[in-house]
């Protein structure tokens, strides 16, 4: 036990208090305790108790209750429209499918419940009455920045293969080191990740790749990543004999991920996949230099394939694949081409592309970084100026509409075609986005083509 105090939110304190008043041990448990000790704001407050589910429902009969988790001893209380999961102390049976316990049995000992959890930093409980209960050294591992399984790591990972990805995800989020026995078990059992639903793999991958220490964590367990997402195997073992590079493709990708400077999931995924097609197109010239002609197109195709397999939502998949396709873009210096690109992407996607291109550039050979980054900074400055001026980049911003064209006699497809021509004229600076000027231009056009 520890004398440390954790500030509980009022609903959580209320639940613990009512259970204690009725003779049942109850604790905040798991991630909320870990995050509190790290001085982070917990996303969820989970509660564990000696009370059985039916008793929990009885004690909180004055509160809306969801009974969807009764099979595993979980009751969800809705307080101020926020869900609080309350789960009876339990021990898990065998994990025949390598993902879920075949059965659960209730217990009256909090230590038995904590013993079934994945990592020591997640196996702590707290109540104001007892302080922190930490039978597996979670506080010490937090202090020493260590990721360690509870008990035998091979057993923990064999029970539930998703824990492999969770381990790497926590290393990526917290910047902690996975201790040797736990990391050895990750290596030994990485192929069992195939038991896990693709959606769950994607959820963990996304959390890991967007985290501050993503590169370090992925570098520690590449076999797991490549087994979870087979297309990413193409990053491994691909040299880049070129004056523009000092790393092979895998290390280049990790260095770029270190430099991404954002937790935007679309940008982070794009960096992870941006060179995944290089292996397929690599050639070596007579001068000994490697070339990767068409690698952006190939990488985008692999990206689309991988994200479909992972059941990524369509919008994210399309945006990521687009960034991968364009990541090697030389930003046009001509005003018209620049604005057309900006209009095609929109500001949000354009800024993502700049972030991806900058991270990619920072992972190149030192001599070429400065010029690349200056060009990107200039492009960002120009885009910001246009955005601040609310420059017209879309039909929505154009000062005339289809109804105006109908008044001049345009019909059907001609309306859309003409609006797009006018928009392009505005983008190129041939016409101002001024309603009177655009209407006058239309009038002259129709008179000329009568």
Stretches with model-predicted labels:
Residues 1-450:
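Catalytic cores of the polymerase beta-like nucleotidyltransferase superfamily
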């Amino acid at each position: 036990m520890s004398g440390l105090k954790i500030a509980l939110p009022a609903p959580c304190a209320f639940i613990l208090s009512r259970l204690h008043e009725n003779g049942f041990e109850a604790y905040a448990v798991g991630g909320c305790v870990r995050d509190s000790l790290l001085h982070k704001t917990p996303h969820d407050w989970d509660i564990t108790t000696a009370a059985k589910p039916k008793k929990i429902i009885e004690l909180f009969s004055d509160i809306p209750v969801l009974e969807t988790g009764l099979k595993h001893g979980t009751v969800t209380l809705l307080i101020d429209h926020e869900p609080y999961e309350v789960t009876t102390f339990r021990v898990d049976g065998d994990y025949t499918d390598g993902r879920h316990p075949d059965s659960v049995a209730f217990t009256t000992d909090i230590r038995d419940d904590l013993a079934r959890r994945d990592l020591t930093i997640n196996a702590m409980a707290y109540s104001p009455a007892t302080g922190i209960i930490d039978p597996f050294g979670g506080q010490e591992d937090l202090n020493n920045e260590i990721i360690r399984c509870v008990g035998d790591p091979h057993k923990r990972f064999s029970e539930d293969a998703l824990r492999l990805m969770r381990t790497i995800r926590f290393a990526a989020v917290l910047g902690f080191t996975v201790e040797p026995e736990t990391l050895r078990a990750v290596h030994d059992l990485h192929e069992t990740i195939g038991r896990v639903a693709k959606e769950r793999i994607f959820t963990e991958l996304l959390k890991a790749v967007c985290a501050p220490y993503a590169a370090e964590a992925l570098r520690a367990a590449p076999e797991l990543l490549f087994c979870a997402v087979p297309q990413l195997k193409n990053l491994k073992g691909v040299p880049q004999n070129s004056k523009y590079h000092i790393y092979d493709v895998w290390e280049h990708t990790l260095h770029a991920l270190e430099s991404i400077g954002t937790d935007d999931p679309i940008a982070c995924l794009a960096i992870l996949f941006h060179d995944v097609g290089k292996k397929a197109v690599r050639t070596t010239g007579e001068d000994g230099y490697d070339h990767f002609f068409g690698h952006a197109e190939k990488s985008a195709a692999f990206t689309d394939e991988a994200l479909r397999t992972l059941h990524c939502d369509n919008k994210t998949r399309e945006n990521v694949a687009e960034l991968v396709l364009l990541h090697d873009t030389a930003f046009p210096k001509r005003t018209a081409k620049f604005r057309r690109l900006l209009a095609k992407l929109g500001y949000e996607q354009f800024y993502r592309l700049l972030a991806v291109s900058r991270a990619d550039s920072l992972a190149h050979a030192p001599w070429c970084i400065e010029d690349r980054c200056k060009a990107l900074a200039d492009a960002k400055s120009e885009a910001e100026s246009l955005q601040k001026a609310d420059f017209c980049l879309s039909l929505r911003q154009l000062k005339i509409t289809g109804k105006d064209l109908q008044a001049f006699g345009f019909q059907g497809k001609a309306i859309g075609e003409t609006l797009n021509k006018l928009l392009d004229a505005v983008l190129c600076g041939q016409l101002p986005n001024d309603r009177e000027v655009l209407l006058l231009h239309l009038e002259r056009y129709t008179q000329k083509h009568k």
